Structures are given as C-alpha cells and as structure tokens.
Amino acid sequence: MFSNQSRSGRGKVFGLNPNVFFLGIVSLLTDVSTEMIFTLVPLFLCNVLGAATTIVGLVGGASESTDAILRIFSGWLSDRVKKRKPLAVLGYSISTIAKPFMYLATSWGSVLAIRFGDRLGKGIRTPSRDALIADSVSAQERGRGFGLHRAMDTTGAVLGLALAAVIIYLVQGGGLELSLKTYQWLIVVGVVPAVLSVVVLLSFVHERKPPPPARQLPRIRLAGFDTRFKLFLIVMAIFTLGNSSDFFVILRAQNLGASVIYVVLMLVVFNLTYALTALPAGVLSDRLGRRGLIAAGWFIYALVYLGFALASEPWQVWLLFAGYGVYYGMVEGVARAFVADLVPVEKRGTAYGLYHGVVGLALLPASLIAGWLWDAVNPAAPFYFGAALAFLGMVGIMGLVRE
C-alpha cells in the first residue's frame, strides 16, 4: 500500500499522495453515518410521518439545492483564500452536528430543516475537498485519484447499509414499513462514525501548496471559463433534470413489494457495484478519455430507469440497483476529473462549485417533477422521464463537448 516518498515528504498510499487516501477515509466514515441516518428518510417520511410523495420530492430536492448553492460560494471562497482544509473541516463539522437532531424529528418540516443543516455542511465542504484531491495529484493521476476516493466513499456506504440491515433485522425483522424505534436506533449508532470523520480530517489531511495567485481575484462567473466547460455544464443540467433524488428509487422498491430490510440490502448491492466500478473507470478515463465514459454511463442510466418504469416484481429491482451502481461508478468520479481537465488550476475550486451548483440546482425541479409525476400519473412515470433526458444528455455530450 505504501510506496516511495511523495513531494510533500510523506510516503505515498496506493501510489498517490496520502491526502487522497485520508480524504477517502473521511468520506468512508461520513458515508457510514449518512447511509444509516439519511438513506431511509423517504421511508421515514412516508411510513412514520405519513407524508405524500410530493413532499418526499420537496425534501429531497430542496436539501440538494441547498447543498448546490453553498458549493458555488464555498468553491469560490477556497480559490480566493487559497485554503481548502478549513472549509472542509467546517463543512464536515456542521453535518455531524445536524445528524443527532433527526432523533427528535416529528414532522416533514423538521426533517427538511435538519436535512438543510446536513446539506449546508456538504455544500461547504465538497468543492474544497475535491480541490484538495485535484491539488494532490498530477494530471496523469487525476482519474485514479478521484476513482480511489469514490471507491472508498462508496465502501463506507456499503458498511453503513450493512450495519443498518443488522439493526433493522434485530429491531423489526422483515416488516414492510419502517418503524420509529428502528429509525431512532439507526440515528444513535450512525452519529459515531460522523464524529470520527472530523477527527481524521483534522489529524491526517494536510493543506497542499496553493496554486500561483491569479492576476485577478477569482469571481463567481462563467465568463472566464473555456467554452467546453460551459457546454459541459449545460449538458449536465439537461441530464440532471431527469435525475431526481435517489429517494424515488427507494420508494419504487417498496412500491413493488420489497420490505425495509430488502430495500437496504438492495442499496448494499448498488454500492458494491458502485465501489467495484469507480476505480477501474477512473483508470480507464486516464487512458481513453473521460467524455465517452460519461456518455456510456448515461446510457446505462437510461436503461436502468426504463427498467424501474417497467418492473413488476421485487426480484427485478435487485438487478436494477446493481446496474444503477455501475452508472454511478462510471460517471461520478470521472465527471469530477473531467471538470479539472477543462479549467485552469487556480480556478478549480470555483469550477467545482459551479459544477456541483448546476447539478444540485437542477435536482430541485427534477425531484418536484418526479413527485408530481408519481402522484398525478403513476409510479413509473418519473422513470420514463428520466430515461428520456438521459438519452438527450448522452447525445449532447458527444455532439457538443470536446475532450
């Protein structure tokens, strides 16, 4: 695992700067916590609080948009002050503080407020964390660096979901609906790894040497960016309008008859395929280019969403969750590496903020549309809509965005 000394004087881990590995550990611990506490929010809203599907879409979309807006400004701020780590620490700390309050939630409004706090933290930390990773690797290592980080992040999700499945089994067995007692146990256990993630970040991640100062202080605007980056953001927005909150795939699994513990185990399958795909996809993108892999991932997404629309039995959903993980593994880390390819080093924080901002802002209308289609048409309708926009995005990235 450890190899020759890096330029910072610390031994490399998996052939990369140690920052990448320890940021992966931070994300792993955070995802253990997040998957235990927040993944089952749609079931908590519907099964425990009796909320409508449109409310689920509102909570999912609004929380992601909060994350998005903050990413724009935190990315810009990290470029302006040339400090990534303090913003990352602040963001992870806010999310950790918000999580225990889910134990006290008694209405969808309180859930929305707590999710706002959690996403506030994520919005602050994510661009700085991504910029720290990009600053810690060479251009030739970028895909591998982001791929390793995504693989570790997703490994945390698998561990969190596996632990959640054990708790669900011990508390409520194979019940079709989530109980309040079960959810409260998930919160109590899930807070612990969140605290540990902040400790690791403070102790083991080091600020990299800042990039050379720009002639002008960075501004939050697109004018200074390459046309390729602007077109990529447009195509991402089109795709994301059909990529509603993952709350809906969870609700669809339950809608087709899957019990709570089966839903959690399906999510384990999703995250396993995600983790197994992320690093190879990153390495492949370093060799073959990133645009084609993103397009291929969107094609898989379209097929999976068509599958969710057409599915009629719970066993079919297991296969769809596996395919959904392949899509995530192919696209998430590769798209972030592609952003770094398209922008100068001194604007990376701002670029990541804009990228995450465009994606997150599109998630609010995407989730509201999905909730409305579910209630007004049928549970399959949001997935037909998502598949159509994925095909459109695939055509857009191949036809408009150059490597």
Give the predicted meaning of each segment.
Residues 86-100, 191, 292-307, 387:
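Structural signature of the two symmetry-related core transmembrane helices
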Residues 9-68, 229-266:
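Helix-loop boundary and gating motifs at the non-cytosolic
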